[in-house]
Every structure is written in C-alpha cells, then in structure tokens.
C-alpha cells in the first residue's frame, strides 16, 4: 500500500485528510520497528523450522517484477509458533539461503532438529553447512499443496484423501505401496503428482523414521497454510507494491496481527516433546 493509498483510505473511511508527509513519517517508524524485530535474539533450540515463500509484485525502475517473500516459522521448545524473520529476494539459491541461515545462527540459534522446506533450491545444502546435524525434511503440507495445484476442484478431496494414505503410513515400505496404489489410480489423469513424490522421495522418506507424535506435529501444523491464506487476503487487492520497503511494512504489520492469535501450544506438543527428548537426547535442553 502506497502513501497515496493510505491517504485515500483515511479520507474515504474516516473523512480524515492527512498529508502525505505525515503518513510517510509515520510509516518510516514501522521500518525501524521491523529492523529491531528482524535482529532480535532468538532461542537456542527450535525443534522444528518451517520455511515458506509468497510471490508478490513490486515496481522497479518503472516496471513490474516478481519478488519472493520468504518466511521462517519456528516451533519453540514450549510448542509455540514463532515467526523468526522476513526476507525479500529476486531469486533463490544456495548463496541467498546461506545468508539467511547464518543470520539465524548469529541471532542465537544453536540447533534445529528438523527443517521442513518446500524443495527450495540450495536450502538443504545451506542449512546442512551451518547446522550439520539438522534433518532436512520436505514439508508434507507443501508437498500436498503442490500436488493439488492443478487438480480439478471435484477431484481435490479424493486426491487429498489418497495422499493422506501415503504420509500417514506406518513405515516407508507401506508408504511406497500406498504411492504405487495412488499412481495406478490417478496417473492416467494426473501423472505429475506421483512423479513429483517419487522425484522428491529422498527428502520424504526420513519422515517415516520419526515417531508418530513428531510426524503429527509436522503434517498437522497448519500455521504455514494459515499464514498463506491470511496474507493472500491482504495482498490480493494491492496490485504491485511500490517498492521493497512497502512489502516489508505490510507483511510485518499483517504477520504481527496474525501472531497475536498464537496463544496456545501446538496440540499434542507434550507427547511430541517427549519423543524429541528421546530421539535427540544428546542435543536436548531441559
């Protein structure tokens, strides 16, 4: 939202005429708040880290271009969701992600047990170079989301149910059998779905080595989807942002509002924490 947009909204909604200069001065204060928030100290350990990306439009030298807005969402030892930072980039890659992960480490993170990513190019290598003991796992929520991206609405429910039979399997072997069954049922109509799962299987199958309580936290944590839905509602009417600073302002304010609702720990967190204590005993802090 530009300064002129804010000025117009205030006039339309409240019949208040505020100068562009005053609005600019007020919103510049938000950037200082964002800077302090983005540099705040973080916890020593985050059992789970999720990374997500939203693509928005931004103006640059008179033309509209894509900007990727990356969000890092951590789950604390208390089971609370915490947004760790916002980063804006034209492209993703190993160098970009190495900078992000190094920044998180410099802000105090000493260990991440499981990092859930969306097949982001260069991210697994970056996190493994900074946190070599972290298990990088393809995010099941993202994988399902990408699977149904081009599926007809009438087929989505059935597709999701059949995909669930894969990621809720008790063992990797059972999951492979479920994937084979999925392929036999759907490959004629949607061949790319089973192909995508097989192509990414190396980053999926470690999931089946986790105890059920940890698995539930990974695939039922809907914070990523909630963030996406809430943010898209805000940005879908904005058109192109005037610059990167305006993207930061809007996302920060929106995310601050969303985070106020994160008052309770993740459901079944105590059971998951006990399993983390067993599985990562040498790295676990009481």
Over which residues does each language-model region extend?
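Conserved beta-strand -> loop -> alpha-helix junction used to position metal-binding or nucleic-acid-contacting
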Residues: 114-121, 126-162
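Conserved phosphate-chemistry cores used by DNA topoisomerases
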Residues: 28, 44-47, 82-85, 98-102, ...
């Amino acid at each position: 939202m530009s300064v002129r947009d804010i000025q117009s909204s205030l006039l339309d909604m409240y019949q208040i005429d505020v100068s562009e200069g005053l609005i600019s001065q007020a919103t510049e204060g938000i950037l200082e708040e964002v800077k302090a928030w983005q540099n705040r100290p973080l916890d020593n350990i985050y059992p789970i880290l999720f990374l997500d990306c939203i693509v928005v439009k931004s103006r640059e030298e008179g033309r509209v271009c894509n900007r990727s807005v990356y969000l890092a969402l951590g789950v604390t030892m208390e089971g609370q969701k915490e947004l760790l930072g916002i980063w804006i980039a034209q492209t993703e890659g190993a160098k970009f992600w190495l900078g992000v992960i190094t920044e998180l480490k410099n802000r105090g993170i000493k260990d991440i047990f499981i990092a859930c990513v969306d097949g982001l190019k260069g991210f697994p290598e970056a996190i493994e170079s900074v946190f070599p003991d972290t298990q990088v796992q393809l995010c099941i929520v993202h994988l399902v989301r990408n699977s149904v991206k081009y599926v007809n609405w009438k087929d989505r429910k059935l597709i999701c149910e059949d995909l669930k039979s894969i990621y809720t399997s008790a063992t990797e072997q059972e999951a492979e059998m479920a994937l084979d069954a999925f392929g036999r049922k759907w490959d004629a109509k949607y061949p790319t779905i089973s192909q995508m799962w097989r192509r990414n299987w190396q980053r999926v199958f470690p999931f089946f080595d986790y105890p059920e309580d940890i698995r539930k936290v990974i695939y039922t944590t809907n914070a990523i989807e909630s963030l996406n839905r809430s943010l898209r509602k805000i940005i879908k009417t904005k058109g192109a942002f005037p610059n990167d600073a305006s993207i930061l302002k809007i996302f920060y304010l929106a995310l601050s509002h969303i985070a106020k609702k994160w008052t309770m720990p993740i459901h079944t967190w105590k059971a998951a924490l006990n399993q983390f204590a067993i599985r990562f005993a040498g790295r676990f802090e009481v």
